[in-house]
Structure formats: C-alpha cells, structure tokens
C-alpha cells in the first residue's frame, strides 16, 4: 500500500470540514507530547476550539502556545491478500495543521466563534448566556502550515 501527499489546499480543507473531532498536540512542562481530542470549528484558515476556563492544558499553553492539530476521515480497512497480514492497511486521508493559540476574551467574539464551532455539527441556532460565555475558554488558532496525506492506496490507484 502506498501513501501520497495531498497538495491541494481545498482537499485538505475538505478533510478538516468532514472530520468529527480533531486531536490537539501540545507540550507539557517536561517537554513531553500531550494530545487532546476536541470539538472544533474551521473558517477562513482559522481553527476554533473551546474548553473549560482552567486546567492543565491551559497552563501548558501559557508556557508554549504552539500546537499541532490533526484531522482524519474515510477510514477503511483494505488489503491485497486476505491471508497475508502485512498486506493490510487502513485507507484514509489526514490533515495536519500547525499554529499558535490565542485566547479570546471579547464576549461578542466568543459568541461568533462558538456559533462557528456549533455550525460544524448542526444547523441549529443558539444563544449563549453571559455566565456561560464568561466560563468558557475560546481558542483561536490561525493555521501557519497545513499538510495532508492519503494512505492505503494500492499500486494502481491514484491519489
């Protein structure tokens, strides 16, 4: 099975838009990786996330705001021969984005971003109470670098 880079930005953005969750990689105080599955929204080259107002991940981001965020879609088990274990692979597409987190404090901007996140999952309209807005941490990650890959293609298949 073969792996190919995805060059087209539109296709990479399609992977992002069709993913249900993302995985956010940050660095803990000892320099170790720390990866969190999160809900998200994406618009105009910016990934939006939200979390509780305090906790370990926020402390880590205060020390180092660089993140790596991954997305994937279309997971399908494929093989070349059903009795040969090494011929099995997982066909899928992935996107990886790098950027720096900033936290949004403005209440109207929080509302707008929370709508972007919610519209990733549903077309419903929502309202947000002032206490809810005060107690949510809204993350903004402008994408600095975006790459994509397709995995598990047979020799004759094109990416």
Label each residue range with its predicted role.
Residues 45-46, 65, 144-146:
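Beta-strand-connecting loop/turn residues
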């Amino acid at each position: 099975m073969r792996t190919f880079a995805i060059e087209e930005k539109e296709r990479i953005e399609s992977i992002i838009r069709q993913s249900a969750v993302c995985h956010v990689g940050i660095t803990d105080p000892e320099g170790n990786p720390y990866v969190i599955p999160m809900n998200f929204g994406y618009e105009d080259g910016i990934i939006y996330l939200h979390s509780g107002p305090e906790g370990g991940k926020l402390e880590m981001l205060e020390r180092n705001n660089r993140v790596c965020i991954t997305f994937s879609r279309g997971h399908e088990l494929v093989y070349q021969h059903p009795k040969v274990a090494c011929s099995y692979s997982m066909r899928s597409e992935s996107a990886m984005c790098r950027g720096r987190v900033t936290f949004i404090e403005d209440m109207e901007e929080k509302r707008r971003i929370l709508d972007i996140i919610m519209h990733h999952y549903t077309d419903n309209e929502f309202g947000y109470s002032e206490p809810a807005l005060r107690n949510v941490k809204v993350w903004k990650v402008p994408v600095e670098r975006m790459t994509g890959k397709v995995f598990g293609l047979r020799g004759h298949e094109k990416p």
